Amino acid sequence: MEEQQPPSIKKKIVDFLTNFLKKRPSHEDLRRDNILVAPNNVSPAIQPSRYELEGHLNPSSHNRDDSSNNNNNNNNNNNTVEYSRGHSKSHSRSDSKHHNRENSKSDRDNSRSDNIRFGRKDTFKNAWDYLRNIDFTFSKTKYGNTVVHRLKHPQFGLSPEELQSLYPDQPHGIPIVLTKCFEYLSKHLETEGLFRVPGSNREVSLLKFKIEDGDLDFSEVLIPYNICGLISTFFKELPEPLIPFDYYNDAILITKLGSKDKYIIGLRDLVLSLPPANLCMLRKLLEFLLTVEKKNEFNKMTISNISIIFGVTLLKDPDTVDPMKSLNNIQAQSTIIKYMLEYFNDIFKEASVVKAYRKSIVPKEPMDTTSISYLDPAESNGGSPRTSNTPYQQQHQLSSQSMANIKPRPPSRSKMMRETIVLSPRVSGGNNQVYANATMTRPMSRLFFDPEIIPSPPPTTTTTTTTTTNTTTTTTTTNTTPNNTTTVNIQQKPVPPKPNLIPRKLPPNPNYSTYPAPLPPRQPNTIPLAPIPPPKPNSTYKKQITQPPPPRKPTSPSPPIATLKPTSKSDFIPSTNNNLNNNNTTTTTSSLISIPKAKPPPPKRNNVVSPAIEEPINPNLNINSTTTTPTPPLASFKNNGTISSGSKSNPNLQNLLNTNQPLVSSNGPPNKPPPQPFELLKSKPITTTPTIKKGVTFSETPKISNSPPSPSSSSPSPPHNQPIIVNKPIPSKSAPPPVRTTSSPSIVTKKFVPTIPTQTTTASSSSTPTTPKNQHLSKDDSSIPPINTSQTNNNISNSSIPSPKSKSALSLSTPKDSITGKPIKPPSNSDLSISTTPLPPTSSSPTSSSPLQSPKISSPSVLTVSQKIALNEKIAANQAKKNPLSNSGGLKQISPDLIKSNNINK
């Protein structure tokens, strides 16, 4: 058994190495899965090798090493290795399917080795354990669907910037793997064919695994060619060439310049344009290659040979991926490296390049996130070299002798109001050290900078003529600086008390005029509102109404005029002459100069005054004290109970009430203000009778005599004497209007006979004129010549107020001679004078005694169309038999309307 064990162990090692090397993921797969990039919150550092061969060969430290290895295995791959001397060893391996290992055979081999003593064949066992740890380093851990390759210290496949950020402590600003390789090859410079003779790919892969696992000891490497292959592998696996793709075309153009000076200038500009990490790595590589070239007598590696080897590695054509197609560019690529090596001092020893190189060596300080203490800057005082040796602390860490009597100077801050808050009174120096090393700034509280809450106390002047308040009982020192900062410094000997959040109230200094007196604390809603001063009294009424509120839509109809009640001493009778010709615009009404209310009531619709009208107002008006706008002077009540209008053309109120006609038309838009009072006075009267274009006019007034009108002959009549027509016929467009007549006793008796004022002129003016019932002429009536009106059957003719549709509703009557009773010869159409001006509907009464009485009011008869046609035909036939008409005897042609009217009346 013991003789067969070594072959099985050897076979197991060989099988493991064979499968492991074949199944390792390629570099492209690792880069695609973003495996080699360390997390951002981790700042790893190069550690010494954990798996040294001496530790495995040492029996005393074997158990301790195994326990540490087991912990690492549990953290990385959830694998457990239990191994102890003199006891059975059970080995459970996970993720074996990823590497296609022979688990069953390995388990059988492990079961066979349970009875083997630890002292036998320790070299093979320790080697197996060592290789197994390397296997765990590159084993896969599956988290859901993501496969993570655990790499302790990745070196290959990372860009120079990533390597500098991951390993800030690396010497010379280059990865430590290059540093170790350069150190090893510097001892074997006389070896012939360095970088030209390839190394073993198997050895290069094992070295790469070993380096990324943390073992950088090359003392056991016997072949320098393997180290040269390791350097070439490092540059070949970079994500981009050391001279990036963006600079490839510029580099190729340099080779076509044709002179040494142009080569140097072009290459110098190319080097300065490279990223800092690439510049640092390129210079260190070229320095080492020049060292190799110095031993070219032994190693046979000249500049031409080196440039051919590294030209393809450091420069790659971005347009050609296939290496066979890029053979044409090999000469240009090698020429660039050749010129860099030949003119190294002229390129890299220039001042600008040296300055850029020095900047590239010093990387940015990484933040150690391995502990939560990085959130508290007070924890980093003197313990970490990156914080204890910063230039800021070296500048502000003064000696005890200089800090004894010198006022501390706060560090430069931004213009924002900030304060220094000491998180912990840590002191890393002796007893005389004044400053704490760790402070954190944050925005100052509003409590210290709001003068309305707490006033700024004036600084007390001391004998040292500074603005510092020095006390012996406290350890806080307040410094007034121009940028409004407050620095709190902690001294060492006295115990630092807790900061007092409530500042003391100091009495104000009356001699210091720049600081205001202390104000009481702010109270919410205690500022009274400023009273609104009353407006100045206006002397004119026009200024009071210059800006009225906008008109609002009416919410309720305006009250009718019938609801007005007569008031004593406030009855107003507007005068047309005074209202139109008055130039005095001054009023002394008390309501015009009253103090405006907080919210005045909305104006009425009938009382809105347009601001564009600047017509003066009659001072004789008695304006109601409740409103500031005058009431429209439409009509007023007098003591006699009648209604008098302001002008000759005002309509009769009773007729308006009988016809249910509104005073102001509501057909307009709702927001249009009603007409003004003086506009109503000047406007034409509201007529209810349309104009008849033909020779007959339907009049609403009684007969008019031919005597000249006189103002004394017209007087208003009481409204109770006005005849009211009820049961008016419904007008129709298609049918003729009904005829109201009393001339035919067979049809109806005691009915009204609406007649027209026959405006005919006679040759003789000796006829006795009759006194009219009412003489109310419009402006156009003065041009009408004297007319002769006849009375028929002593009946008063009056008409009702027709609607606009009943334009043809006419009642015709033929005038007769008062002496003979015969019909008067009607004049011709040329002699007939027609008044086209509508007469206003007025209520009239006789001015003198008249035997005529008011007729009785009854419902008029309505004749249908067929009845009127039959009646007209019958009357016309009878009349034709009795009095045949002829055109002789001085009579002119009679109009058909007069003939029809004559026949009907007969």
Swiss-Prot record:
Keywords: Cytoplasm, GTPase activation. This is Rho GTPase-activating protein gacJ. GO terms for molecular function: GTPase activator activity. The record marks 196 as: Arginine finger. It comes from Dictyostelium discoideum. Pfam families: RhoGAP. PANTHER family: RHO GTPASE-ACTIVATING PROTEIN GACJ (PTHR23176:SF127), RHO/RAC/CDC GTPASE-ACTIVATING PROTEIN (PTHR23176). SMART domains: RhoGAP. GO terms for cellular component: cytoplasm; plasma membrane. It is found in: Cytoplasm. Residues 92-117 have a biased composition (Basic and acidic residues).
